[in-house]
């Protein structure tokens, strides 16, 4: 979340980022809430059946049941494999398909979601990592490892499990080519490499899927505080194009691209946050097709009963 540069340092970490951080690698039962904004103590209103409901997933057991790796069924929610060998086969298929230009939506989005869950499984069972990564091509192995390390950095922001679901509305992400066009337009105008903007977009709102319903805090796909938006934004704070250009404008004012570390730290005053952004950016810099996977990552949220998937159309009532 970018801060108003002229107001001096503000060491708070984005409430949204902290909550997303804990489910950066979905699949584990994780514990977190905002360090800056305590989780509300009131219970959330039950979700009407007329809108998509949150899907609960529990943490895997210490000894999951081995599973075969069936052919993808794109009509069902993806599920990560339950043993190292099957996960290696599954992730090899996922990573190859994500890099195949002939694969498009809706299959592409489904595969990105499965990639997210597979990475979560590796986070849950780190002893599988050598087996799984060993089955991947070297370039792909580096991309997967970079994503796993980024997830570890974001989990450093974790805290207690929230007591209620967030004041969010979940919307569909804009198409890949459209968002890539926005990042590259911002890069051409402000000199900020596109993959840093994509990393912020991923970490802050899962490529614009999260719409905060509170007018008091950070808003929009790139999570601007209203005062900061007044200085660096133009147009609609909830518009991907306008928000991405504003983020590039802010980073430029904060020292980018000459000093990306400094500029990213100005965006959100957490070194773990900066480390994660750099790691995701390096994945996309070295392998631009990596964005195709990240674009499919979904919104998960931690609860007392496990992580829940907040699907497109979900809104807190």
Annotated model-derived regions:
Residues 211-217:
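Glycine- and aromatic-rich loop/turn segments at beta-sheet edges
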Residues 127-131, 191-199, 212, 256-267, ...:
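Surface-exposed patches in mature extracellular/periplasmic domains of secreted proteins
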Residues 21, 218, 236:
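Generic anion/oxyanion-binding catalytic loop in active/binding sites
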Residues 103-106, 216, 262:
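Surface-exposed, polar/charged faces of alpha-helical domains
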Residues 1-185, 271, 279-317:
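Cell-wall glycan-active module
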Residues 174-189, 195, 208, 221, ...:
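Alpha-helical segment that forms one wall of the substrate-binding/catalytic cleft
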Residues 203-206:
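Solvent-exposed coil/turn segments that connect beta secondary-structure elements
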């Amino acid at each position: 979340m970018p801060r108003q540069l002229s107001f001096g340092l503000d060491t708070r970490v984005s409430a949204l980022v902290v909550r997303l951080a804990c489910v950066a690698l979905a699949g584990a039962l994780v514990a977190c809430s905002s360090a800056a904004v305590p989780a509300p103590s009131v219970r959330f209103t039950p979700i009407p059946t007329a809108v998509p409901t949150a899907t609960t997933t529990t943490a895997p057991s210490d000894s999951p049941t081995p599973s075969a790796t069936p052919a993808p069924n794109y009509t069902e929610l993806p599920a990560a494999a339950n043993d190292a060998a099957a996960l290696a086969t599954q992730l090899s298929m996922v990573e190859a398909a994500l890099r195949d230009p002939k694969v498009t939506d809706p299959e592409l989005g489904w595969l990105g979601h499965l990639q997210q869950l597979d990475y979560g499984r590796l986070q849950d069972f780190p002893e599988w990592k050598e087996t799984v990564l060993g089955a991947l091509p070297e370039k792909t192995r580096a991309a997967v490892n970079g994503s796993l390390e980024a997830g570890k950095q974001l989990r450093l922001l974790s805290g207690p499990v929230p007591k209620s679901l967030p004041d969010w509305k979940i919307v569909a992400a804009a198409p890949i080519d459209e968002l890539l066009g926005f990042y590259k337009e911002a890069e051409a105008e402000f000199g900020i490499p596109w993959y840093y903007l994509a990393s912020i977009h991923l970490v802050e709102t899962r490529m614009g899927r999260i719409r905060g319903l509170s007018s008091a805090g950070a808003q929009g796909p790139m999570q601007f505080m209203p005062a900061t938006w007044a200085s660096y934004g133009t147009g609609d704070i909830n518009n991907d194009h306008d928000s991405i250009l504003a983020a590039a404008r802010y980073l430029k004012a904060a020292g980018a691209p000459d000093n990306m570390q400094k500029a990213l730290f100005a965006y959100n005053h957490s070194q773990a946050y900066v480390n994660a952004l750099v790691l995701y950016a390096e994945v996309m810099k070295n392998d631009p097709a990596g964005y195709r996977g990240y674009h499919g990552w979904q919104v998960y949220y931690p609860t007392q009963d496990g992580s829940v998937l907040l699907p497109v159309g979900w809104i807190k009532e």
